[in-house]
């Protein structure tokens, strides 16, 4: 009976020892594999293996490899559309070669100056008749009575007339002087300004006075 108990006890202790040794072997193998995997072959920021089984010393990475290749390589997410500005020149869209860059009388700006044609004319029509050239200067600068500005002065025709009609009648010229300057007079009554022609004003005034006397 005692002998049987000793055999059972010996068998039980042997199983415990075998299981412990097997566990120790497994733990040692896992630790060895982890150490060998973590110190894997990293080539310049390249294939960093993350603890997988390396076959024959090669770079078998079970994890993801870093994309940064040493000394160049392609950078993911690079700009697919390079800037269109060419170094040292390039063609500016819309401009034409030759002395008449804006010969089609296009509207354009350079700095703070804007206008039509080669000489920044105030309108396409002015550019078409040669604004800024020798054939445009003189008395026919604004012969079509166009509205234009020079600095802070704006008006119609050659002499900055207040309206196109006055420019057509010769505003600012000798034939215009004294003709249309004071054709109306203003009378203020009860805060209301009335623009009445001079002759009519005197006739109405005389008629009113005559009716009062009667």
Swiss-Prot record:
Q: What is the lineage of its organism?
A: Eukaryota, Fungi, Dikarya, Ascomycota, Saccharomycotina
Lipid linkage positions (GPI-anchor amidated glycine): 191
UniProt biased composition (Gly residues): 42-60
Task: List the induction conditions.
Answer: Induced by HAP43.
- Positions annotated with a glycan in the UniProt record: 182
Which keywords belong to this entry? Cell membrane, Glycoprotein, GPI-anchor, Lipoprotein, Membrane, Secreted, Signal
Compositionally biased, Low complexity: which spans?
Answer: 76-85
Q: Which family does it belong to?
A: Belongs to the PGA37 family.
Statement: the UniProt record of this protein carries the keyword Transmembrane helix = no
Note down the stretches annotated as region Disordered: 36-101
- Function, as annotated: Predicted GPI-anchored protein which may have a role during host infection.
Protein name, as recorded: Predicted GPI-anchored protein 57
Query: What species does this protein belong to?
Result: Candida albicans (strain SC5314 / ATCC MYA-2876) (Yeast)
Query: What topology in the membrane does the UniProt record assign?
Result: Lipid-anchor; GPI-anchor
């Amino acid at each position: 009976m005692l002998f049987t108990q000793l055999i059972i006890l010996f068998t039980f202790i042997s199983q415990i020892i075998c299981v412990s040794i097997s566990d120790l072997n497994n733990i040692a193998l896992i630790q060895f594999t982890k150490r060998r995997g973590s110190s894997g072959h990293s080539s310049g920021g390249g294939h960093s293996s993350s603890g997988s089984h390396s076959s024959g010393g090669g770079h078998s990475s079970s994890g993801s490899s870093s994309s940064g290749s040493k000394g160049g390589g392609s950078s993911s997410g690079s700009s697919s559309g390079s800037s269109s500005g060419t170094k040292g020149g390039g063609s500016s869209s819309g401009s034409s070669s030759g002395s008449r860059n804006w010969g089609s009388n296009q509207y354009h700006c350079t700095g703070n100056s804007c206008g039509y044609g080669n000489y920044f004319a105030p309108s396409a029509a002015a550019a078409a008749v040669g604004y800024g050239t020798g054939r445009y200067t003189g008395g026919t600068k604004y012969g079509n009575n166009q509205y234009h500005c020079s600095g802070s002065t704006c008006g119609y025709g050659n002499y900055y007339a207040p309206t196109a009609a006055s420019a057509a009648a010769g505003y600012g010229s000798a034939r215009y002087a004294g003709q249309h300057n004071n054709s109306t007079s203003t009378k203020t009554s009860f805060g209301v300004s009335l623009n009445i022609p001079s002759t009519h004003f005197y006739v109405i005034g005389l008629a009113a006075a005559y009716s009062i006397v009667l």
